Amino acid sequence: MKNILEKYAKLLCHYSLELKQGEKLYISTTTLAQPLVREIYREATKIGVHVEVAFSFREQGKILYDNAPDSLLRQEPTFHKLAISEFDAYLNIRAPFNLNETNNIDKAKRKIRTEALTPINNIYFERTADRNAPNGLKRSLCQYPTQANAQAANMSLEEYQQFVFNACHLFSDNPEGEWLKVRAQQQHIKEYMDKVSLVRYKADHTDISFSVEGRTWINSDGQTNMPSGEVFSGPVEDSVNGKVHFTFASIFMGQDVQGITLWVENGEVVKWDAEVGNKVLDEVFKIPGAKFFGEVAIGTNYNIQRTTRNILFDEKIGGSIHMAVGQSYKQTGGKNQSGIHWDMITDMTESGEIYADGTLIYEKGKFLI
């Protein structure tokens, strides 16, 4: 295990975050991820990087929501804001204790907290729009395998560890080399899509189109997410029209939502339905900006072939597409603003098609270009 975590740490420090001597790295995670944090701290320190770690403990979020007055929920987390505003690199390691920890908290309190964090999220999206800009923030999101995620994926912890490490190419003798291959393959797709104006996703119960004219497609190659394997952009906000059905379950703040269908007119979600969790959608679409799309994407990681109820992996499934309501990514040219960014995914391997300016470029989970 130590050997694989050493490889993981080196991949994150050198490839994903491209850390350099004199930089400041902010790590946010739970105490469960301590074994990986130790190796990252070791590797970053060798480079000459100043590291600060924010560990959260079991049920910290629930304790806050259960006990804090509204005035406290409206306060911004001081150090988190400082780090997001001023540090050079940010690594968020997901390592949950319990995926259902905050399921039963008061919805009004959740909304207050979401709105309070919006200004920090805006700083985050602004700084991560271009990691190479003078005030850019290099960021990466990764996973440390825990029992909670293993149970959600219907796997043993050992099986889940194998799944996570395989998705990151950590069993390769040269993980960074594998990700450089991914980068090259996806760059071809990115350059093709950058010349496209109108995109159409078509599958069972789905027929939705949108403009990406003037927008940029991003080659997500394992730097901002580890694992990665997707190309994504931001649709022109008022151009999305049609109906889209998401075949994979989605999780919103610990709540399970299945069989989501959205009807969209001139960019705005005008009707919604879910086989499970429709009330969650009712609450989500009350959030400012949530009725408009911030992202459209295509998953390309064929090392991920099953859902695990974890969006970091599920949205990358080779042969899938996803769309996110809420906040746009600045680097795509997207302009939608919201306190949320929620990805919803559908399988394209059975009957899926993608058209670019009327040309079929993707069929049954595979690119034709």
Each PLM stretch: what is its role?
Residues 32-33, 96-98, 146, 206, ...:
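Short, glycine-/Ser/Thr-/acidic-enriched flexible segments
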Residues 92, 142, 202, 211, ...:
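Residues in well-ordered beta-strands of folded domains
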Residues 322-369:
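Intrinsically disordered terminal and processing segments
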Residues 198-201, 260, 270, 350-360:
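Short polybasic amphipathic segments
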Residues 227-272:
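Oxyanion-binding "anion nests"
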Residues 271-335, 354:
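Dual-mode signal for accessory low-complexity, basic/Gly-rich regions
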